[in-house]
Amino acid sequence: MLSFQYPDVYRDETSVQDYHGHKICDPYAWLEDPDSEQTKAFVEAQNKITVPFLEQCPIRGLYKERMTELYDYPKYSCHFKKGKRYFYFYNTGLQNQRVLYVQDSLEGEARVFLDPNTLSDDGTVALRGYAFSEDGEYFAYGLSASGSDWVTIKFMKVDGAKELPDVLERVKFTCMAWTHDGKGMFYNSYPQQDGKSDGTETSTNLHQKLCYHVLGTDQSEDVLCAEFPDEPKWMGGAELSDDGRYVLLSIWEGCDPVNRLWYCDLQQGSNGINGILKWVKLIDNFEGEYDYITNEGTVFTFKTNRNSPNYRLINIDFTDPDESKWKVLVPEHEKDVLEWVACVRSNFLVLCYLRNVKNILQLHDLTTGALLKTFPLDVGSVVGYSGRKKDSEIFYQFTSFLSPGVIYHCDLTREELEPRVFREVTVKGIDASDYQTIQVFYPSKDGTKIPMFIVHKKGIKLDGSHPAFLYGYGGFNISITPNYSVSRLIFVRHMGGVLAVANIRGGGEYGETWHKGGILANKQNCFDDFQCAAEYLIKEGYTTSKRLTINGGSNGGLLVAACANQRPDLFGCVIAQVGVMDMLKFHKFTIGHAWTTDYGCSDSKQHFEWLLKYSPLHNVKLPEADDIQYPSMLLLTADHDDRVVPLHSLKFIATLQYIVGRSRKQSNPLLIHVDTKAGHGPGKPTAKVIEEVSDMFAFIARCLNIEWIQ
């Protein structure tokens, strides 16, 4: 029996907020100040019990050693052409950050173009976004430090990889779009704010602006091109049309797949970009998504979900843009979701569909929309693509649960459009033929069939004896497609585990209908779908509740925390990474206001009632039955997470330890680990990734008594 002495934590019982006549106590509101001595002491006290617990997990050393060994395989991106040169990203295996290489031809010698590993000693400075000028002679790139969303943009001359003096600050959630003359670039920035902006602050991000930077000038001289003073939450990203004539401005209000679309004809203004652009408001509502694909003169092709939840391709003529005049180029598919489209070799379109959570890649004719070819693909995901309108070739990258990656190359100038394997990677030490992946469709509470992938060793007995690791996300129209994960395969190989990934509602797996089925008033469907996935795994003999771990990050952290509250008896272990835990206040911090499109907002009485029912922070209660306790729980967060600020996890763990952890029947640990110089996830250095997964799987092994299998 494990029993814990948790830190004594001050509760401010006078901290009460009134929501529509409901008095809600918030005794740990003081943890919302990341800079107070009290918060720092709280974090230190929590890490003091968690770190030794993790370090004493018997398999942590074995796991970390194996992870370091198996993760040491080469990782490549697709090649992409810019100007006369080819570029690609490559990580030799264990480098903290991947390196950008350049070649003069596909057969030419590869040279390092930009190595982010040289920018910090510990790998915590990461590349976050980049853009080449149209002729491929200039390169803009964003850098973020310690995992923060704040970005500094710098510039290089491509010839000789020469650093330029230009620097752009106060940049976040930015576009990077060069005008075709190569003179400058559109980007987004936020107004100055009080206090610091290093990713440890919690202040809200409002009033994003679109600016134009002229190469060789100071940022103070940049031109303001669009702002929305009456709509502080709006964010507007610019892109240039393929012919360079039009600037297209997509305006988003939150995370819903809907945007306004304004444009400016750069040939109309004779004196260049010197102020707010003359925007034509082509689409001036939030009733659909319009994703620019290409244009032939004034006829523009968009991917849209307007009256087509699975998406279709339409043509809009800017000279006659009334909706009644729109033409359908590729109609909506009744089942498959159109994920992305690219124009290549001037008259082809590459379309990527999602069919039952597996990708399909097709070539169509730009003029007629007709299907020309379906590219052969195994069961899995297309995770990389390159090829633009002016290119005559494409590269695409495939991966699956058991294949780390194959990159294909297809020359579109040939009669026979046959892709060839350009590069294939294998991982030494994991033989894919020992394992199998199956997809099942299990019923949720309301009868909806939910897809789930299950990966396990071939020939296992379904006798309930296996530990299982169930992952889910369920939000923001994001589809969780098959991906290669060494850390999870080690669980399958060396911990005798079963890996399951449930494609619950809220995601985009079946288009906007699936997304809407798991948001706002329907958010409980996500939790029901996930709990039914767990019940399916138990019923079919893969595992038992005591041997089942659930895991999710961000919105998935909310998912697993809510499920632990609702069904503590159903899980043995819960690992919640950077989760959204305070559903009444999330919109007040950094970019949280953008998530109200999925969650709603407690400022509304109706939304407040939905949120209060499942908010992890507000639904912790000691199980009534004597033989039921909370599962072992590990929360993970980090000091520079300015997407989902750490206060969510801090307040939640304090509440768990107070309400549940003090009970004598609660022998399972309730712990948090707060990392430093780390953020929400993007750009995390390899060394930190290895430490994090070693902590996670060591915690699972210790709490569920799992032996290491050599």
UniProtKB/Swiss-Prot annotation:
EC number(s) per entry: 3.4.21.26
Keywords, in A-Z order: Acetylation, Cytoplasm, Hydrolase, Protease, Serine protease
Enzyme type, top EC level: hydrolase
GO cellular component: cytoplasm; cytosol; extracellular region; nucleus
Tissue expression as described in the entry: Expressed in all tissues tested: uterus, kidney, heart, lung, small intestine, smooth muscle, liver, spleen, thymus, adrenal, pituitary and whole brain.
Pfam families according to UniProt: Peptidase_S9, Peptidase_S9_N
Superkingdom of source: Eukaryota
Molecular-function GO terms, alphabetical: endopeptidase activity; metallocarboxypeptidase activity; oligopeptidase activity; peptide binding; serine-type endopeptidase activity
Keyword match Flavoprotein: no
Modification sites for N6-acetyllysine: K157
Stated family: Belongs to the peptidase S9A family.
PANTHER family cross-referenced by the UniProt entry: PROLYL ENDOPEPTIDASE (PTHR42881:SF2)
Protein name as it appears in the record: Prolyl endopeptidase
Gene, per the UniProt record: Prep
